[in-house]
Amino acid sequence: MTAILTWNIQCGLGCDGVVDLARIARLARSMGDADVLSLQEVARNDPAIAGGADQVAELQALFPDHQAFFGAGLSRRAAGRARREFGNLLLSRLPVLQLFCHLL
C-alpha cells in the first residue's frame, strides 16, 4: 500500500515561534513511513523567512531517499540574489512519471 502525507508546514514555523525543518522531518516520520510527502508553504531564498534559507534543499537533504519536486506559487526577482520563491514541495520515494504545475 502507498502511504501519502500532506502537510502545510508553514515554512517550518512551530507553535514555539521557531523555524525547525529537522523537527518537521521527525514529526513526519513519526506519523508513518510515507512514500510521498506533499508539503505546502515551503520557502526558498526569502530573507523574511528563516533568513533566506533554501528550504527545498534542506528538506531534500532530510529525506535523502525521496526525489524532490518544487512548484513555486510565488516567484519574485530579488536584486543581486536568487529568486524568492514560495510554494509546494513534493517528496516521493516512488517513480514520478509526469508532473504538472498549475498556477491558480
Where are these regions (language model features)?
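Ligand-binding beta-strand-loop-alpha-helix segment within the catalytic cores
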Residues: L91
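N-terminal, active-site-proximal structural segment of metallo-dependent hydrolase catalytic domains
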Residues: M1-D65, F70-F86, F100
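Active-site catalytic loop in hydrolytic enzyme cores
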Residues: L94-L104
